[in-house]
Amino acid sequence: MRAIEILGGFGLDHLKLVDRPDPAPGPGQVVVAMKAASLNYRDLLVATGKYNPKMPLPRIPCSDGAGVVEAVGEGVSTVKVGDRVASTFFQGWVSGGYNEAVGKTALGGAIDGVLAERVVLEADGVVPIPGDLSFEEATTLPCAALTAWHGLVESGHVKAGESVLVQGTGGVSLFALQFARLHGARVIVTSSSDEKLRKAMAMGASDGVNYKDTPDWDKRVVELTGGVGVDHVVEVGGSGTLGRSVQAVRAGGHIALIGVLTQGDFDTRPLLMRSIRLQGIYVGSRTMFEAMNRAIALHGVRPTIDRVFPMEQAADALGYLESAGHFGKVVVRIG
C-alpha cells in the first residue's frame, strides 16, 4: 500500500510517498481503506518537528480520516466489513474525562496516523459517517468539528439567544459558527479578511470584525453586545489573543481555549475578578463524537471544504494550510 511518511527528519520536504506492507487487524481492531484525510494545524506542527522534536521517525501523519472497513479482527462485533467510518482522534477515549493514558492514543502523533491507503484502528476508534456526507466531508469531523462541539455544546452548554465570538475562519471556527447557529445563538466572527467575513456572514454569522482594521476588536465585540460582552468565546489564537477574549466575554462568561496559534503574556487576574470560566478543550471522546453526528445528520450540517489535494501533493496541502489563506478545511484525497 502507499503511505505518506515523515522520513529522515522534520520539515515539509521530508514528507515522502512510500510503499508499506498491507496491515492486518489484531484482536479488537479493524482495517480501514482510507479515502480521504483532512489537515489540522497540529499536523503542520508534527511534520515540522514543532509538536514533538523527539518523535521517533518514520511516522505517518494526520489524525482525521474517513473510509471503508476492509477487515475486522477477532472479537469485533460493533463494526462490519463495508461500513463507512471516520477515525476518532484519540483511539483510547471512548467516554468519560480526558487523562494521560488517553493522550498516548492520539493518531498522527504518539502513533501512526491516517495518511495511508490502509490503516489499522481500534474498533472503538471508528464511528459511522453521519447522514449522506462524502468521505471528504466526513474526514473534517474527528478533530475540527468535535473540538467545536466539545467547546460550545458539551462544555459551554450554549443556549438559544446567547452570543458566541468565533475567531477566524478555519475548520474549528466554522464548525463553531454552524453549531452555535444550530442551537439558536448569535455569532460574531473575527478575521483579517473582509471577503472571509462576508462568507462567514453568508453562513449565518450576525456580525464580522476585521481585526486588522480594528486592532481593539474586543472593544468592538463589547459594543456589538450592548456593552455586556459575549456569553462564549471560541479561542483559537492562544495566549496572544486570550487577553482580548477575556475583555470581550461577559462577566461570568465562558471561554473555550482551543488554539496555540499565537504567543504572548497573559494576565490571569480578570478571570478571577470577573468570574470567567476558562476551559481547555482537547478534541473529545467517542461518546461526544456520536452525539455530534446525530445532530449533524438531523440538521443536515455540511462541512466547509476549501480545497482538496491528491495524496501525492500532501506536502503542498500542508504548505497551503500554513499560508492561512483557506476558508474551512483542507483535505487530502487518498483512495
Feature-to-residue mapping (PLM):
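NAD(P)H dinucleotide-binding glycine-rich loop of Rossmann-like/cofactor-binding domains
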Residues: 33, 90-167, 202
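Glycine-rich phosphate-binding loop and adjacent beta-alpha segment
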Residues: 102-104, 183, 194, 201, ...
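Glycine-rich beta-strand-centered segment in the early N-terminal region that forms part
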Residues: 22-37, 50-94, 110-112, 125, ...
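N-terminal Rossmann-fold NAD(P) dinucleotide-binding loop
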Residues: 173-174
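Short N-terminal strand-loop motif that marks the start
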Residues: 1-65, 121, 212, 319-323, ...
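Adenosine-nucleotide cofactor-binding segment
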Residues: 166-169, 181-240, 244
